[in-house]
Amino acid sequence: IVQNAHRIVEGQMPIKGGRDDDFFMIESAGLACQRLICDLVSTRLPKSYGYDPVRDIQVLCPTKVGPTGSVELNRRLQAILNPPAPDKPQIMWEQSGRVLRCGDKVMQIKNDYDIPYERDGAEAGVGAYNGDMGIITAVDPESRAVTVQMDDRKYIYGADQLAELEPAYAVTVHKSQGSEFPAVIMPVADV
C-alpha cells in the first residue's frame, strides 16, 4: 500500500497486486462493479481473509450518487448483510424508504455535543461526532428510538435524533477522513 501511495502522489499508476498482495485493482464499471463490490464485501474477503463484513470492511465511494455511490451501495449491502427478519426490529421512513435495522452499521453525520453515552452501564459523558461509526444494537419501533454501540460508548437516539444517523456500509471518502479500517474497497472510475 505504501509503495502504491507514493506512486499515486508522484502521478504514476499503482502496481497491480497478486493473490498474496494487500493491494488489488479489479477492472469493472457500473452495475457490474456494484455486484462485484457486494460480492467482495459479503463473500470473497470474509472467506479469503477472515474479515467480518460489517465491522472490518469499509467501502469508500468518491460520490453519493450512481450505482457505485454510497446511497445505492448502502441499500444493496444492507439487503445482503442485514436483511429484514422477524427478529430484527426496524424503523422505516415512508417517504424515502430509508430503513434503520438492528444490526446495521451506521455513521453519525453531524456533531451532537449533547447526546449522552454510557460505558459499562453507567453514564460516562456526552457527545457524538461527525464520522463516528457504530452498530445498531437495539430498535424500539414504537418510540422510534435506536441504541448504537460506538466502540466502548453506547448511545440511545430518540426519534428526533435519527436524522443524525446514516447507513455506513459504504461512505464517501470525504466522510471517512481520519478513519482507519482493516480492509477498504474503493470504486474508482476512469483509472
Question: Which residues fall in each region the model found?
Answer:
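Conserved nucleotide-binding/hydrolysis modules and their immediate coupling elements
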Residues: 75-191
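Conserved helicase motor core of P-loop NTPases
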Residues: 1-126
